[in-house]
Amino acid sequence: MSSRKENLDNLKNFWPDDAPNISQIPKYVDKYKKEKIVIKCGGKVLIDPDLFNKFIEDIAILYKLGIPVIIVHGGGPRIKIELAKLNIESQFIKGLRITNKQTMEVVERALVDFNSEIIEKLKKKECKASGLNVSQNNIFEVEQENKELGFVGKPKKISNKKIQTIIDQQK
C-alpha cells in the first residue's frame, strides 16, 4: 500500500484549485479513516454525465486517501424511463411509487445497471469497488410500508457485520 506522502503527492495532480489547501488533508484523513462514510447519490446525478464524472472523481480521491466509502444510490429518473419504455405507468402514494412485481423487476434492473456503471468508472480510476445487491445479500431486514404500496418497505435492521466484511475485502 502507498504511503501517505505518496498519496498526497498523487493527489496534487488532480486536487482542485478552489479546494482547501492540500496540507489540511492529513488531519481529516486520520479522523475519518476508521469511519464508514456513507454517501447518498440521487438518480439525477447519475444521469447527468458531468455530475456523474465529478461524483466519481470525488469518490476516487477519498479512496486514494484510504477513506472507505459506501455509496447508496438512487435511480428514480432511469427507473421512470425504463418503465415508460415498457408502457408501465407509475402511481404514487405520498411520493412513494406503488411497486408491484413487474415494476420491482424493472427497478432492480435499473439499479443494478447504475451500480455496474459506478463500479466500472471507479475501477477505471484504479479504485477497488464492488456492487452490493441488497436483495441478494440479506443485508437488510425490512417491513412492508403498507399493502397498497406493494414491494415498498422500511429497513428494520441492517447487518453491519456483512457490510464490514465487504469493506474489508476492498482493502
Residue ranges of each PLM-predicted region?
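Nucleotide/pyrophosphate-binding catalytic subdomain
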Residues: 1-171
